[in-house]
Amino acid sequence: MDFNISGIGNVS
């Protein structure tokens, strides 16, 4: 699970 400060990322 990876999310960045701008809220765009990947959820696994």
From Swiss-Prot:
It is a multi-pass membrane protein. It comes from the Eukaryota. One of its GO terms (cellular component) is membrane. Its main location: membrane. The keyword Membrane applies. Each Drosophila eye is composed of 800 facets or ommatidia. Each ommatidium contains 8 photoreceptor cells (R1-R8), the R1 to R6 cells are outer cells, while R7 and R8 are inner cells. Visual pigments are the light-absorbing molecules that mediate vision. They consist of an apoprotein, opsin, covalently linked to cis-retinal. Belongs to the G-protein coupled receptor 1 family. Opsin subfamily. This is Opsin Rh3. It comes from Drosophila virilis (Fruit fly).
